[in-house]
Swiss-Prot record:
It is found in: Cytoplasm. It is an enzyme of class 2 (transferase). SUPFAM superfamilies: Actin-like ATPase domain. GO terms for molecular function: iron ion binding; N(6)-L-threonylcarbamoyladenine synthase activity. Its EC number is 2.3.1.234. This is tRNA N6-adenosine threonylcarbamoyltransferase. The keyword Protein transport does not apply. It comes from Staphylothermus marinus (strain ATCC 43588 / DSM 3639 / JCM 9404 / F1). Binds 1 Fe(2+) ion per subunit. HAMAP family: Kae1. Its cofactor is Fe(2+). Pfam families: TsaD.
Amino acid sequence: MGIESTSHTFGVGIVKYVSSINETRILANTYDKYIPEKGGIHPREAALHHARVAAKVLSDALQKANISMRDVSAIAVALGPGLGPCLRVGASLARFLSSYYNIPLIPVNHAVAHIEIGKFLFGFKDPLIIYVSGGNTLIAIQRKKRYRILGETLDIPIGNLLDTFAREIGLAPPYIVNGKHQVDICAEWGSEFISLPYTVKGSDLSFSGLLTAALSLAEKYIDNKKKLGNVCLSLRETAFNMLVEVAERSLVLAGKKEVLLVGGVASNKVLRKKLELMASLHGAKYAGTPPEYSGDNGAMIAYTGLLGYLHNVIVEPRKAFVRQRWRLDEVELPWIQD
């Protein structure tokens, strides 16, 4: 069982490992998402939401998997990175379940889990990883039992860029409508590309200048739907093209034959098409996690917890401390084969 509570989503996932045929099955992936009435995520309000829905989400997951807690052999929990109050809700529940049912507790890094669920779904062994979300934007490869970061944002993540822009110009919340981000919906109103700050430094990116410039333009055109659409279109294309550039550079330098897109922004169809085209030009196989697994979810924690369980990555409940800042490249992963 895996518990996710790093940010706006409280989720519980359950996976089953059949050792006789070396097969893993996802039995349940239930969640409840905190959606603020206005503004961004308020950590304490999100934590209160998680505490309110935890019992029901857990019960729904067990019902979906058609099992009871007595059938669960181990508990995995995302201990970071994330928002402190939110992390503590999941950690407290995991510590209680581990102690009460006397089953092992496996610590999971949230970023690692996004990658591992993607590799599992598509059978990838050694991909170039493009991780894009509201909290992360980075390019990584696996090497010497760790994920090594080749490039990353120097300021704000790409998901934060899109959400902040949509919120500041009055389009959000909600940020997603019928599977589309508000920036994508707004971009459909426009047809003209406007030059905006494009900041790439080697394999690193910077989005803050792009956000400032786009907001400045949007303020002028807030009552002109077509011109506002041009700003949205230009913001999206500039940000995504920056990401594709650093991904392509990293792909060539690392010599990988698989490209894996993970994280919440991985559900964006425009970005997926751009990266798929880039990968095909270099003869690489491309895959992006589907919407049900690209956002925060418990199944990815459960699956990564399974990997940890099979490699004896276990922590005592009293030592299962949350880590608000826990970089991807700080985690040693015994299951990675060089």
